[in-house]
Amino acid sequence: MRYAPTVLRARTLSIWFAAITVMASGSALAEEVLSDEPADTLKYVVGLAATSSSNYPGSANNEFKLRPLWALQYGRLRISTSRAGGFMSNASETVNPGASAELIRHDRLKIGAGLRIDGGRSPSDDPLLASLPEIRRTLRARVYASYAITEQWGVSTGITQDLLGREGGATALMDTSYRTRLSPQTELLLGGGLSFGNGKYMNSYFGVPQASSLQSGLPAYQPGAGIRDVHAAIGLTTHLSDRWIIFGELNLSRLLGDAASSPLTQKSSNVGGSIGLAYRCCD
């Protein structure tokens, strides 16, 4: 179903209004829980990273890019690019990109919500996708929670949903992490977990519609909801000074289930990574 532009604009504005309201109320709640924290201050991170990642999930090819890193945080409100948000504190964290608000932070538990732009997928991303429909850019909402089992071990989970009805569907993940200091300046982070997609997400990213099958020669394919991949990462972060940080990360993932069986999956396993330099201010 296609929406008229005015209806879509109204819907988008209402989504943003609701999200801002949730973030604001969540910040107030967090202030009640953490009333002994110091006054809110503005923090930021800027930097640059070289990254390697697959053209799309299941692609046989990796693309290399230079990406800017930036993040802004005021109290429990944060907006950041991928990876940058984790450098706001002396102990690196796993922080998803986009805008987020920490709604509850009590002892070892954190609960939050956020928004991010999902870039979708273009037929031009890979020759194999040329006859497939575009997956349009959309806005995703995310709810997440993490729990520190010990100072070193932690678990986290999150759910995302396409808010604009652009066939992005819903995703979920469950992760565990281990972090330890190799020296006063250097921290090692190990992590791994599973990701899942509902039927709409899996069909958009791993399905082949009948019409596209006739054009591309690929067999028609309609995956069901379920597990998408298993993934792991190892990362090192070194503080060169109070402000400057250098980091590197190696990522491994393997598609499973219907995602691995898709005609679009040229390679079920992928190795990627990043290395970069960032400047952080001000504690």
Listing of model-derived features with the role each one plays in the protein:
Residues 1-41, 283:
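Cleavable N-terminal export/targeting peptides
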Residues 29-79, 85-87, 108-110, 121:
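Short glycine/proline- and aromatic-enriched beta-strand/turn motifs that initiate or cap beta-hairpins
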Residues 46-48, 70, 81, 111-115, ...:
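Membrane-embedded beta-strand positions of outer-membrane beta-barrel proteins
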Residues 44, 76-80, 109, 151-155, ...:
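Repeated loop/turn-to-beta-strand initiation elements of outer-membrane beta-barrel proteins
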Residues 42, 62-68, 107, 135-141, ...:
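Residues that define the transmembrane beta-barrel architecture of outer-membrane proteins
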Residues 67-69, 73-75, 176, 268-283:
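Outer-membrane beta-barrel "beta-signal"
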Residues 50-54, 74-76, 85-87, 115-121, ...:
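Transmembrane beta-strands of outer-membrane beta-barrel pores
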Residues 31-33, 162-260, 264-266, 281-283:
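Outer-membrane beta-barrel transmembrane domain signature
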